[in-house]
Amino acid sequence: MPKEKYDPPDPRRLYTIMSAEEVASGKKSHWTELEISGRVRSLSSSLWTLTHLTALHINNNNLSRIPPEIAKLPHLVYLNLSSNKLRSLPAELGNMVTLRELLLNNNCLRVLPYELGRLFQLQTLGLKGNPLSQDILNLYQEPDGTRKLLNYMLDNLAVHPEQLPQRPWITLRERDQMMPTAVFTVMCYNVLCDKYATRQLYGYCPSWALNWEYRKKGIMEEITNCDADIISLQEVETEQYYTFFLETLKDRGYDGFFCPKSRAKLVSEQERKHVDGCGVFFKTEKFALVQKHTVEFNQVAMANSEGSEVMLNRVMTKDNIGVAVLLEVKKDLFATGLKPPPEKQLLLVANAHMHWDPEYSDVKLIQTMMFLSELKSIAERASGSINSSSPTSETSSIPIVLCADLNSLPDSGVVEYLSNGGVAENHKDFKELRYSDCLTNFSCNGKNGKPDGSITHSFQLKSAYEGNLMPYTNYTYDFKGVIDYIFFSKTHMSVLGVLGPLETQWLKDNNITGCPHPHIPSDHFSLLAQLEYHPPLPPLNGLHLPVHSTACESKMLTE
């Protein structure tokens, strides 16, 4: 059902005629409704150029057909075709998904195109006075008959095309042949939890294609086709993690770690099975698990509220979580050439799903700050205790890969914070709420802060998908944009290539107004990046070289 309130056109259709003075002064006319009457038999093709129309009244005429070009009026919410001589309707009528009211009363219609089922925002469908089949009329005359009839037609509409085109692989740079680097792939994918996949949210998708038993096959096919070395998933239902994802991926050589959202602690055992969370999987032939961690944002918020009411009332009430696994990179993953350093090569892989509501940009930003603050503590402890031979126990000594559904656009404070290493404490995304007293708890500068009043983190991160490589990661009728990300430590890693987007024109040509779709099992597209890890170089004459060495340094080390 549509989310916005619909007000039908005023039947009186009041209008005002501009005076000669108004015309002379250059005043522009504005009209969005059109009525055509007079027992008209055919329609002029110039009608389809009036793309600004929101209401079209062509009832009480002698029209026997409606041309498919009517779908060129993309803003129509009201269409009255009643009391004509229509015997059929064009299938293209189903592309007019903005329609809220479609009146077809008193015509000669015996059948309806199943494409009408795609009109998921339609509230009123007038069919009285047509010689339709009894099955259609019976369904239409039931309580909430319009909705039931549209659902029936959508569920029985033939699906085209039969398969998706391949997404392109975008090569960004070549592997460093001079150094013993490790190359691996990382996937980030929000799989759309079953309980969120409702017809209320995704009315444009057939009910059978929203069903989890159908969608999970497409989701696993997407995962296995990508064959990533590290997989980060969001919106994984607890029961499905253990009975489906872990079970299936273990057979393919993965191990995994999962944690549900914090509300799992507060519900019954039966309800707990359906709480979603975040999971990380990794190929055991390439990585070994060292540590695993869960970060509950509401608990971190409570511990750092500093008496802040907005922290308690806005941040602590959200049950989002993040997970992290500390992995050892196995030596076989490194290319031949220089031997990798004898010390353990560690990698911190983090995965999170931030709060969804656009009105809570402050919460998303603080959740991100809390997550990086906790990751900093994890990295510092790991660097000091496990890799004590490292020249430093600083956070930056352990590289990080951060995958997340941030529910934030590229121009948001969240992405600015991650990409630039900090954000101003008076950033607009804080909504002028009083967080300043507790924000410094999450800054790498601690209570001292920075002179410019910014909140910083100590990870030097870069997005694998920079620029416009991916125009959208979330693709629904109401929203199309980038909210999913893969970040990595740019001091230790570089990105060699990424999986590109599904062609926008293909989606338009096939009238895919949003996902999920019978061929696209989630409302998100997966991200896949190939990363190259440059381990620290062994000391040269007692000096520790930078991670990214020059070719000259490489030559010196091989001699």
From Swiss-Prot:
Keyword field: Cytoplasm, Exonuclease, Hydrolase, Leucine-rich repeat, Magnesium, Metal-binding, mRNA processing, Nuclease, Nucleus, Repeat, RNA-mediated gene silencing, Transcription, Transcription regulation, Translation regulation
InterPro entries per record: CCR4/nocturin_mRNA_transcr (IPR050410), Endo/exonu/phosph_ase_sf (IPR036691), Endo/exonuclease/phosphatase (IPR005135), Leu-rich_rpt (IPR001611), Leu-rich_rpt_typical-subtyp (IPR003591), LRR_dom_sf (IPR032675)
Record-listed substrate binding positions: 235, 271, 353, 358, 407, 474, 479
Note on how the cofactor is bound: Binds 2 magnesium ions, but the ions interact each with only 1 or 2 residues.
Main localization category: cytoplasm
A GO CC term assigned to this protein in UniProt: cytoplasm
Protein task: Poly(A) nuclease with 3'-5' RNase activity. Catalytic component of the CCR4-NOT complex which is one of the major cellular mRNA deadenylases and is linked to various cellular processes including bulk mRNA degradation, miRNA-mediated repression, translational repression during translational initiation and general transcription regulation. Additional complex functions may be a consequence of its influence on mRNA expression.
Record note on quaternary structure: Component of the CCR4-NOT complex.
Protein name in UniProt: CCR4-NOT transcription complex subunit 6-like
Species: Danio rerio (Zebrafish)
